Amino acid sequence: MAKFLSQDAIQKFKECFSLYDKKGKGKIPAGDLLTVMRCLGTCPTPGEVTRHLQVHKIGKDGEVDFSTFLTIMYRQQKQEDPENEIMVAMLMSDKQKKGVIPLKELRAKLTQMGEKLTPEEVDDLLKGVKVGPDGMVKYEEFVRQITLPVPDY
């Protein structure tokens, strides 16, 4: 799986992995896998981590070597596609398939569903979003805007 990851990503993963490799054996405790993965920006659930370990036949008291860790991270990153998840949710709301959603409805969804955002958080998300004269937002542009990578200063 390493061939699918950039050298920068592998280096970043190695640095974090090494922090949890307390014995210096090139392995981390399976119990630390969730924490290490989250430190590197993925959001696995405990159930997903358990499944990753099961796939590699590693018990919860076992250890994960770096090669296996790279495979797990690759698979986790591949399944976590926030842009696609949000687009699917928007498409489900767009009964007429016009590519737009009323700003009022978008605001309501963001504050009342899923991981509920505060009105202030929604205001921040909506900064710079183009709203048509009819009060409609092109949700593809909105999704692209909110899923842009965070600048690394």
UniProtKB/Swiss-Prot annotation:
Q: Which GO terms describe its biological process?
A: brush border assembly
Q: Which residues form the EF-hand domain?
A: 8-43, 44-79, 81-116, 117-152
The molecular function terms of the Gene Ontology recorded here are: calcium ion binding
Cite the CDD domains for this sequence. Answer: EFh
Query: What Gene3D superfamilies does its record include?
Result: EF-hand
Q: Name one GO cellular component term.
A: microvillus
Pfam families, alphabetically?
EF-hand_6
Q: Which UniProt keywords apply?
A: Cell projection, Repeat
- Job description of the protein: As part of the intermicrovillar adhesion complex/IMAC plays a role in epithelial brush border differentiation, controlling microvilli organization and length. Acts as a light chain for MYO7B and is required for efficient targeting of the IMAC to the tips of border brush microvilli.
How does the annotation summarize its subunit structure? Associates with the IMAC/intermicrovillar adhesion complex.
What is the protein's given name?
Calmodulin-like protein 4
Name of the gene encoding the protein in the UniProt record? calml4
